[in-house]
Amino acid sequence: MLDIGTASGSAVELRVVYGSKPGVVCMMDLRGQLTEALADRYRIERKLGQGGWAAVYLAEDVERHSKVAVKALLPTLAELLGPERFAQEIRITSKLQHPHILPLYDSGEADGVLYYVMPYVNGQSLRDLLDDELRLSVDESLRILERVAHALEYAHGEGLIHRDIKPENILLQDGEPLLADFGIALAVSAVGVERLTQTGITVGTPDYMSPEQAVGARLDGRSDVYALGCVAYEMLAGRPPFRADTSEEMMVLQVRQSPPWLRNSRPDVPRHIARAIERALAKSPSHRFASPSEFCRALEGTARVRSWSQLRGRLMKLVGAAALVVIVALVWWFAVR
């Protein structure tokens, strides 16, 4: 959380608690614990990545003979949650069933480590795609945004706010987006922002963080709309709305500064689409779209005609069809005279 009154942040030292003793995270120990405790169910193969609150490993499901991703909460968060509360919260998250949300297969406690299991997506993330191509076409961007917006709308209806929408959490399987990692929603709903930030755990990602999330205010689904607007901007412009050297500076920009007009860096984006993204990035939640589906409808409503050349082509086809009808009518009229 950022204290805007200081216009900077304050670095928080990350200390990890094992029981009542502070210590340092040893990821090899975490992997070793998982490997030993889950040996009869999952064969841990390698580490895929680590964030501020969890580490994820590639594993093989021993029974299904399929690849899965095992996400293990770091000891700090595991200590705050506890196994009983974790089980209650993961039960809510596991009920999410949507074609564009990555499902949960399994969860539990293994030798003190809290974990959950997801399908392994053997593809790339939106981040990988943007790293390769820098920016996407208008059509491809809108296709991805539409599906993610529908997934978010469903999750919000189930009472869950994602809180960490970013390209890394949008996985692409055969080109279809899957929204991953509702774990941060689970953690925040169970523990609370204040307790998490006090331990040094980052809640969300500054480049895509809504102003209200940056200052630790109460959130609703419009915070996810803002983050999705940041992703939309990056897909089309080739960079996020803001650039900063530190997380604290980035959060100040999210709170205080308006993003550059999208069409300055991407003139071929239709004006109404740029306006829709601009509204999604409004500083005040009340000035944004009320829901992801409303944002999606605004994009769809302005996406039917991409350019004047396409409009001209459609008009020419209509004119040609009308002319053909007139000719047929004249031929028939002369024939029956």
Question: Language-model segments: which ranges?
Answer:
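C-terminal or otherwise distal, non-catalytic regulatory regions appended to signaling enzyme catalytic cores
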Residues: L2-A7, E13, V17-V24, A303-R337
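Conserved C-terminal C-lobe helix
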Residues: D268-L281
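Short helix/strand-capping hinge loops at secondary-structure junctions
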Residues: S284-P285
